[in-house]
Swiss-Prot record:
Residues 22-42, 63-72, 128-138, 237-246 have a biased composition (Basic and acidic residues). Its EC number is 3.6.4.12. PANTHER family: SNF2/RAD54 HELICASE FAMILY (PTHR10799). Residues 460-628 form the Helicase ATP-binding domain. Gene3D superfamilies: P-loop containing nucleotide triphosphate hydrolases, Tandem AAA-ATPase domain. It is found in: Nucleus; Chromosome. GO terms for biological process: DNA double-strand break processing; positive regulation of transcription by RNA polymerase II. This is SWI/SNF-related matrix-associated actin-dependent regulator of chromatin subfamily A containing DEAD/H box 1A. It is an enzyme of class 3 (hydrolase). Residues 247-263 have a biased composition (Polar residues). Its main location: nucleus. It comes from Danio rerio. ATP binds at D473, E474, M475, G476, L477, G478, K479, T480.
Length: 972
């Protein structure tokens, strides 16, 4: 933290009162926060020691005056009506303190606000505890609402402070965010980055940071008495202030000197405006060194709405929403705001009510049960009654409404940009090819399709407006080629990079190949390899030893560790291209936050997955491609729309979804194959209902009845139930049925004959075996000769309803000369399918998540060039993206995915450009099983075009939403 920032709230004193403190050279902020030893002018210590350091308000008209014993006569002259008014006010706020204590505080401060801040710092922890004890008293209502709320919040603050002291280290990220939000609620007019810096300067001590800010803004008008006090004291202190300014030590910060000079020239300026001015200066200084800030001028040239105008727009309707603790009573709420609160309480959904601070689900349900709220009187009657609801909830509505206003304002700004773009984009789409030509640096032997040229022109148009975008063409329409053509166009125009292309691991080789094939002029660097290899690569990149235009890397390596992330923060990129951009739909994910730090002027997202009707995901994508627009408001967006309501969405949510989709229209280009590829052969889908074998059916029924008896309140447990049923529906060997406990006991004893296990404990061996499936135990028996006699018979391995149908289907397809791509969710299922294919004497190749990257492109080429290979086995997640297998014309989905769009991606490995035959998609569904229910739910989701992608989920992961739907379907 720069000393420029630290000096902002550092205690300073004129030469008459010395402060003995170490120079702020070290980073130990604990030492800075310790009490400063003070001496009077004669060198003696004062008798009354202060428990905390008093902070000076350099921007206010009143200076802090410490009075010693030898100035007692002067003190008597100052005890007048103003001081009595101050004591009365302080007694109202701190009734548990004696008049003597409060008088001492007033003597040590010159303003009422300064005295309040001083009391909060000294007595805050004591007061909060006392206030909690008084919560049940009826006379508590006699206290001002403002003060009660402050005391209650101080309680939680003291708990946070205590926990930090115990840890004696920087708090966790979650705790930091919580403290930041709490401070933001107290001071909504100050930017978060400024508040974060101040918290850091105070070692994340909330109370000290708040006290510093309160003292700094002590001239904020909170009461008429304070105004009178200011007017009376201004003249008496003006001369003293001038003297102190001239005597200020030269070692004070430039910011402090500037503020002091400014306050002397403009005595009437309010402290909040001074604070805003200082905040602006501080923001400018910190933003210069911040690698996370985007270049606003480069990123958003169309955004001609100034930040100050935006703030005025937000504040015009919601000035009274600003969480001002000085107006925490019902009389202070304006008529317009009352109407908005009534409307919110009347229309908000359960989840939206739960966003109110202190509003639990039970309270939200209570509010809904008390509807309708037609007038402000209705609200006051219900929230003042002794029915478990507090008037604080009504004031909490103001915060939620303000956050809504932030979102509305952001979307309004985006809409202005969208309107300017829509006309140009429409002209490009309607004009068709026109004068659009393929870049000359592209391979002359390869030609772009007409719709690909339109996509290229659209990308060029975005670039001319200095905007980012999302190319969302359906899978198989050549998004990769369009992106390469665009980078080639930039190369022709003299923009030679560097660019970054981030892709899934399975498509890395394909991207490198397509770049070399379509545009050999581009110099491509593959950022890949071990930690040591990447270390030397980074050095060569940063020192300029390697000449390149494009870096191609994977998601895992781009943000793999601190050094990888540091490289792409330091490297000034022109374009960052993200393949499979739907991975960036959640702004709360760690991957999203890391990728946001990549230092690129523009971003281009490629995705074949349609956008979900989920506002958080839409806003996440908007935020990613236009970070300068959203950087300061992501927390409000995330909070407002991260919850998924089980009930019908509110009208506010629906309206924002409609608005977001309208805004995103010019930034997203999506075409489907049926529209642009008239010559592409059709795709036929066939669902094969496979009756389970007799043994499999019995085992499934036993498992279903057992799972149905178990408690299913926990959604995670419910997801596990679904997974167990899915595994049994696919193959019995995915569970442990045939290897009984007695058989495992015999096997564990036999294992002692192995040289590797001669001194092992049979009980521990058996314990390890009990968690394995039948097929895993079968493979174990094949590995160790001592237990080879326990192997399963081949008839048991092939005993599956799907295998019976698959045997017949493969024979027919092979006879017709068709070639097959077979997908499964489970790699273990692929292991069992391999045994079936060997048994049926079918040639095959296999690719899954464990296949080394270097071998993947070779396997794809081997299958595409060798027609003798009949089947390509693929795991749905690893092989379902970015792979071209147009040489096959039949797709078999052995087991369907929870997300139907993953299956659609898998199907499009064959149904894509270059396909000359009708593509047949066969889905194998176990009859009367969990898969039957999954199919119905998936079909409904496809109709709604709602993608159920789980962020960084494991293979076969089931979303909670899917689990709930299946729970109803199965009657669990």
């Amino acid at each position: 933290m720069s000393f420029f920032n630290l000096d902002r709230f550092r205690f300073q004193r004129d030469n008459a009162v010395g402060i003995h403190r170490k120079s702020p050279d070290g980073s130990n902020s604990d030492k800075e926060n310790k009490q400063a030893h003070q001496r009077k002018a004669d060198g003696q210590f004062p008798s009354g020691k202060t428990s905390r350091q008093v902070l000076e308000d350099v921007s206010s008209d009143d200076e802090v005056v410490r009075m010693g014993k030898d100035s007692a006569s002067d003190l008597q002259q100052h005890i007048n009506k103003d001081m009595e008014d101050k004591i009365i006010k302080l007694l109202e706020i701190f009734p548990q303190k004696s008049k003597k204590d409060l008088l001492e505080v007033i003597e040590n401060t010159s303003t009422l606000d300064g005295a309040v801040a001083h009391c909060l710092m000294i007595y805050g922890d004591e007061d909060s505890g006392g206030r909690k004890d008084k919560g049940g008293r009826s006379d508590d209502d006699d206290q001002p609402k403002k003060k009660r709320k402050i005391q209650r919040s101080d309680s939680s603050e003291s708990e946070d402070e205590d926990s930090e002291d115990e840890e004696s280290e920087e708090p966790s990220r979650e705790k930091q965010e919580a403290l930041l939000k709490k401070l933001k609620r107290k001071l909504p007019d100050i930017e978060k980055e400024v508040l974060r810096d101040i918290l850091k300067e105070h070692d994340w001590d909330y109370e000290n940071a708040l006290g510093s800010l309160l003292v700094f803004s002590s001239t904020d008008t909170s009461s008429p008495e304070n105004q009178k006090s200011k007017q009376k004291s201004k003249s008496s202190h003006s001369k003293e202030k001038t003297d102190k300014i001239t005597q200020r030590p030269s070692g004070s910060s430039s910011l402090s000197r500037w503020l002091t000079a400014a306050s002397s020239h403009v005595p009437e300026v309010s402290s909040m405006s001074a604070l805003k001015t200082q905040k602006s200066a501080l923001s400018k200084s910190t933003s210069k060194n911040s690698s996370f800030k985007r270049k606003r001028g480069d990123e958003m040239p169309l955004n001609d709405v100034s930040a100050s105008e935006d703030e005025d727009e937000i504040d015009s309707d919601v000035d009274s929403m600003s969480d001002d603790q000085d107006s925490e009573d019902e009389d202070s709420i304006s008529g317009t705001l009352q109407d908005k609160i009534i409307q919110f309480l009347q229309d908000a959904s359960l989840d939206e009510l739960a966003l109110i601070s202190g509003c639990s689900i039970k309270k939200a349900q209570k509010i809904i049960s008390l509807r309708p709220f037609n007038t402000w009187k209705d609200v006051k009657e219900q929230f003042f009654k002794d029915n478990g609801l507090s008037i604080d909830l009504v004031h909490g509505c103001k915060v939620v409404l303000k956050e809504r206003q932030v979102v509305l304002d952001l979307m309004g700004r985006c809409e202005k940009i969208a309107q300017k773009m829509t006309k140009d984009v429409t002209q490009v789409i309607e004009a068709g090819m026109g004068s659009i030509k393929q870049p000359k640096v592209l391979n002359s032997n390869l030609k772009l399709q007409a719709y690909q040229l339109i996509g290229l022109k659209w990308l060029i148009l975005l670039h001319q407006h200095k905007l980012s975008g999302i190319l969302a063409d359906e899978m198989g329409l050549g998004k990769t080629i369009q992106a390469i053509a665009f980078l080639a166009h930039l190369y022709e125009k003299g923009i030679k990079g560097p660019h970054l292309i981030t892709v899934p691991s399975s498509t890395l080789d394909n991207w490198v190949r397509e770049l070399g094939l379509w545009c050999p002029s581009l110099k491509v660097l593959i950022y890949y390899g071990s930690v040591e290899d990447r270390k030397y690569l980074r050095q060569d990149i940063l020192t300029g030893l390697i000449d390149f235009n494009i870096i191609v890397s994977t998601y895992n390596l781009t943000i793999g560790n601190d050094h990888d992330r540091s490289l792409f923060r330091k490297l000034k990129l022109k374009y960052a291209v993200f393949d499979e951009g739907h991975m960036l739909k959640n702004m709360n994910s760690l991957r999203y936050r890391h990728l946001m730090t990549i230092n690129a002027e523009h971003r281009l997202l490629l995705t074949g997955t349609p956008l979900q009707n989920n506002l958080l995901e839409l806003m996440s994508l908007l935020n990613f491609i236009m970070p300068s627009m959203f950087s300061s408001s992501t927390s409000q967006i995330s909070k407002m729309f991260s919850t998924r309501s089980s009930e019908e969405e509110s009208s506010f949510h629906k309206d924002r979804i409609a608005q977001a989709r309208l805004i995103m229209k010019p930034f997203i280009l999506r075409r489907v194959k049926s529209e642009v590829l008239k010559e592409l052969p059709p795709k036929m889908e066939k669902i094969e209902m496979c009756p389970m074998s007799d043994a499999q059916h019995k085992l499934y029924d036993i498992l279903f009845k057992r799972l149905k008896k178990t408690p299913n309140g926990d959604k995670r447990e419910l997801c596990n139930v679904m997974m167990q049923l899915r595994k049994m529906a696919n193959h019995p060997l995915l569970h442990r049925q045939y290897y009984t406990s007695d058989k495992l006991a015999a096997m564990s004893k036999a294992m002692l004959k192995e040289p590797t296990h001669y001194d092992a404990d049979p009980a521990l061996i058996q314990e390890d075996m009990e968690v394995m499936s039948d097929f895993e135990l079968h493979n174990l028996c094949r590995e160790y000769s001592s237990i080879s006699g326990f192997q399963l018979e081949k008839a048991l391995i092939l005993d599956s309803g799907k295998f019976a149908l698959l045997t017949k289907t493969l024979a027919k397809l092979k006879e017709k000369g068709d070639r097959v791509v077979l997908f499964s969710q489970f790699t273990m299922m692929l292991d069992i399918v391999e045994i079936l294919l060997k048994h049926l004497d079918h040639q095959y190749v296999r690719l899954d998540g464990s296949t080394p990257m270097a071998e993947r492109i070779g396997l794809i080429d081997k299958y595409n060039t060798n027609p003798e290979i009949f089947v390509f086995l693929l795991s749905t997640r690893a092989g379902g993206q970015g792979i071209n297998l147009a040489s096959a014309n039949t797709v078999i989905l052995h087991d369907i995915d929870c997300n139907p769009f993953n299956d659609k991606q898998a199907e499009d490995r064959c149904h894509r450009m270059g396909q000359t035959r009708t593509v047949q998609v066969i889905k194998l569904i176990s009859k009367d099983s969990i898969e039957d229910c999954m199919l119905r739910v998936g079909q409904e989701k496809l109709k709604l075009e709602q993608d159920m992608t789980t962020d960084e989920g494991e293979d076969g992961a089931i979303t909670e939403q899917m689990a709930e739907l299946l729970k109803v379907s199965l009657g669990l």
